[in-house]
Amino acid sequence: MLYLIVLIVTNTDGTFSYYTYDFRSFATALVAFDRKQAEITWDTSRAYYTIKLMDSTGTILKAEERDLTEIRGTVSD
């Protein structure tokens, strides 16, 4: 099964950036933007993902864990 996550970031200048990730089972992605970074951990065996928003020093500003079923969708070929 293919899981795709799209992270959309609003930059301080009002522009948008987006990042896409294809996670087959378990992975962690680190994205840096506007002197902040986001760490996304995707674990399909537990059916959860975790997002941590950190400042440039690595201090966690916000963290949340959610059920994959909240965002799961179907895409056909």
What are these regions (language model features)?
Residues 39-77:
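Short, mixed-charge low-complexity intrinsically disordered segments
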Residues 4-7, 23, 29, 33, ...:
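Hydrophobic beta-strand residues in large extracellular and virion-surface proteins
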Residues 1-19:
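Short aromatic-glycine-(Arg/Gly/Cys) micro-motifs in beta-strand/loop hairpins
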Residues 13, 23-48:
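A short, charged, amphipathic alpha-helix used as a generic interaction element across diverse proteins
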Residues 19-20, 63:
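Eukaryotic scaffold repeat domains enriched in small/polar residues
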Residues 13-15, 24, 57, 69:
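Intrinsic disorder/low-complexity detector
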